[in-house]
Amino acid sequence: CYRKDMLAAAQLTPPSTTEALVKVARQLHDPAKGRYGIAWNAARGTPLGHTFSFLMAKFGQPIVDLPLHAGGFDFQNASGEQLRPMFQSDAAYRACEYMLDILKYSPPNILNMSWYERAQSYASGESCMAYCYTLLAPLIEFDKRSPAYGNTGYLSHPVGNHGRAITPIGGYALAIPANLSKERVEAVWTALKHLTSPNMSK
């Protein structure tokens, strides 16, 4: 999400690519006035892991080596080596570089920022843009005291090179434990496929 009023005042276009987002964040970033370019989940553990996984997708690579097909990536028939993490891929490297780029234009407490802190930073007017999720949208959309109230625009997450506009779901919390008994794996895999199916994602 982004502050429509701030971008308009600076004559900036809402960013649709990661490269454009860095440029807009840089131009809006003004720490002397207590204003920062972008808020995002960078706290240690799950918040940063979640950010990394969806940013890899924005650079064209799921977090595991899923096969590509006409509609995107085939997770329903993935098996074996296709389920290996892609942490040494070009997309993973680019996702890390991008996080280091936006870190420069983030609030001082960015390394302690997870979902609530990120939404609060944006809603309070501290940050001009944020990676948003609908769960905490009431902080923006229902609180008339928020500088972001009535001044917020929404975009799909910006894409990187080789990426495309997607909405990643799940990922970080959806996994099959390595120590799960073999007789339970198929049932858990079936449940995971159902939870991440197109019908459940709507």
Predicted regions and their residues:
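Donor nucleotide-sugar recognition loop
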Residues: 11-22, 112
